[in-house]
Amino acid sequence: MVKKVIRFIVLIIGLSLVAYSGYHLFKIYSDYNTSDKTYEKLQDEYAVDDSKKDDDSTKGSEAQSPWYDDIDIDFAGLRSENPDVVGWIYFENEDISYPVMYSGDNSYYLRKTFKREHATAGSIFLEGSNKTDFSDCHTIIYGHNMKNLSMFGKLKYYNRDENYYDSHQY
């Protein structure tokens, strides 16, 4: 009888731990998903890839395209939503395309999105002691190395795989 009670208690504790862990995993997944959707929406609304524009001036011409793609950002629109935007970081080969935030406080955007909502992913942001016009000798931009490969998550592959650089040069 005592063994049955102990087994039942262990079972309840085990199920409670599984439920608790599942809840937290769901919360993390949901947070990642919300952040991804927020930044995808920003990119769709405010970033225009020049290589995808239908420009009449280049139709029929033999002009060579540059080795990179330009991207036009509607900074006025972005700043109307959040005046802390100071730039946009874009690496086409790494799917890195995010607004760069600045508050002067290195911890403010660590866990806040562009919309100033709490999120594990936070934002990509400029070092608090840097100038917002990027005129410093060295400008430091912070961002998370996310497990779902968002933000700066894909940059780790440059260190892990020597061939990755060859196929993902900017």
Residue ranges of each PLM-predicted region?
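Solvent-exposed, non-transmembrane regions of membrane-associated and secreted proteins
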Residues: V18-Y170
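N-terminal Sec-pathway targeting helices
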Residues: M1-L17
